[in-house]
Amino acid sequence: MSSTTVKNLVNQPYKYGFVTNIEADAIPRGLSEDVVRLISAKKNEPEFMLDFRLRAYRHWLTMAEPTWPAVHYPPIDYQDIIYYSAPKQSKKKLESLDEVDPALLETFEKLGIPLSEQKRLSNVAVDAIFDSVSIGTTFKEKLAEDGVIFCSISEALQEHPDLVQKYLGSVVPTADNFFAALNSAVFSDGSFVFIPKGVKCPMELSTYFRINNGDTGQFERTLIIAEEGASVSYLEGCTAPMYDTNQLHAAVVELVALDNADIKYSTVQNWYAGDENGKGGIYNFVTKRGLCKGVNSKISWTQVETGSAITWKYPSCVLVGDNSVGEFYSIALTNNKQQADTGTKMIHIGKNTRSIIISKGISAGNSANSYRGLVKMGPKAQGARNYSQCDSMLIGDRAAANTFPYIQVDNNTAKVEHEASTSKIGEDQLFYFAQRGISEEDAVSMLVSGFCKDVLNELPMEFAAEADKLLSLKLEGTVG
């Protein structure tokens, strides 16, 4: 495969890189206890929330930034970040989406996320987050008819403080890791979902994250609780403008599944990845963890990672309930000078727990793509089983792929299977396609799509085609 083809395929324009010119209410740069108190005061939070933040901030001051991921970047100046920026509004509390600034509605429509009543998606409820705040949530009232709570976490703190206090930090504690502690101190919004006992959520729930301000970090918090026998499918998407500087995105996601509950969490991550020389792009340092607390509970993570200059995330499952199930399906595509260190942890505690890991890494350009996984069978995980499959594909001759599996088994009745492969798109494959009149670009697209099909099949139907298209767009021109 010629280097020109590879270059053309990789260097696709990023169509979400525009900036919305809108007046913002932003606090000064820098992080201190006063800034933490200011964020809490701006959001008029209950006392327990301020205590939570301050505890996290004090922990964070004692922690060191992790150096073990296989990624390299210049030191981050945490005093040069704006930790809260929100679009200026005429009213403190908006009663409906009709009161949202038209420029914001237009931004989300341009991103393919219409929020106005006439144009909104009919079977998907959306929480739209812009910089540090949620600007609106669709179908809240309709979902409430089934007892489903879907709102921003700021609203949940006002309307359902007991639920937030009970579950916030129960899966990812404030001192869990450096970036989770930072998030716990300064997060300003995110989504809250509560599915009551026995309810199957009647529609897909989705949150769309948009970073706009070039000096602002985004630190959202997502908390999803499924009570006994409840089920929900949730999708998140994200984009950001093209800046020459890097922005920090440090989110935390906590999922709690009680007896016989089922949570499916899907991500299509398309943050700005920087230019072909590695200038600009988002640092995506995220902590995601699900707790299968109840018997027969199930949590499934599906992710398609194509953006960010640097990605550092490991959506994980802690399988406490007997017969609980954890699943992780991932596609991580890197090109140009992107770096990704992603993977999962499956921690088996209960009896007869099961987990499956399917990871597909695709490396093109000068990028580096690492899979890092932990499978841990606890001493009481009688009859537990895990199956892991980690496949890497290299496009071109300058990309790198690494796999770091870690397996710990403390119960002799547990079974663990692990297989891994590395492949490269070869001249013989492209020649075979050419013989049938298929261009090199189409051939690469078809090979990648086939390589990823096990994961794409796990996405909700309406998003699978979008993700497949996104992979093709990201690779257009990698051959030439």
From Swiss-Prot:
Coiled coil: none annotated. NCBIfam families: PRK11814.1, sufB. GO terms for biological process: iron-sulfur cluster assembly. It comes from Synechocystis sp. (strain ATCC 27184 / PCC 6803 / Kazusa). PANTHER family: FES CLUSTER ASSEMBLY PROTEIN SUF, UPF0051 PROTEIN ABCI8, CHLOROPLASTIC-RELATED. Signal peptide: none annotated. This is Iron-sulfur cluster assembly SufBD family protein slr0074. It holds the Pfam family SufBD_N. Belongs to the iron-sulfur cluster assembly SufBD family.
